[in-house]
A protein has these predicted regions:
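Conserved acidic carboxylate
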Residues: 9
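Charged docking surfaces used in two-component/phosphorelay signaling
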Residues: 16-24
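Acidic, metal-coordinating helix/loop segments flanking the phosphotransfer/catalytic sites
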Residues: 31-49, 66, 92
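Hydrophobic residue at a beta-alpha junction
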Residues: 32-33, 56-59, 68, 77, ...
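The feature encodes the CheY-like receiver
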Residues: 45, 57, 75, 87, ...
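C-terminal output helix
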Residues: 107-116
Length: 122
């Protein structure tokens, strides 16, 4: 059975780029455009890992991560923040919200895959 990744990203082009980067893997990809969509997707099918953009419409990534991590049944899902806001303190804010890791945009396929594999082997 392949492992599932939920990609939460409001920009369709960025979702496509990530999907293309993961196309040669065995991961099953699900997508959401915002935090509310992420919560709905998780309720339908629990992912093994979440790639979460932080700057999202409707419900931002910080709020979505906090809600996910507040649920004891979802606490073990690794969440990697993926954001173009690579400012000082952004990684700290992401981790404080409950993200397990952080990848600043732009990133290479190699960098993203290495980060994903780090959590998928657990």
């Amino acid at each position: 059975m392949s492992k599932r990744i939920l990609v939460v990203e409001d920009q369709a082009d960025n979702r496509r780029i990530i999907r293309d980067m993961l196309a040669r893997t065995d991961y099953e990809i699900t997508e959401a455009e915002n935090g509310e969509g992420a919560l709905a997707a998780i309720a339908k099918q629990r992912p093994d890992l979440i790639l979460m953009d932080i700057q999202l419409p409707i419900m931002d990534g910080y709020t979505a991560v906090s809600r996910i991590k507040a649920d004891p049944g979802l606490l073990s899902i690794p969440i990697i923040a993926v954001t173009s806001y690579a400012l000082n303190g952004e990684e700290k804010k992401a981790r404080a919200a409950g993200c397990d890791d952080y990848v600043p945009k732009p990133f290479s396929p190699r960098q993203l895959l290495a980060k994903i594999r780090q959590y998928m082997v657990r």
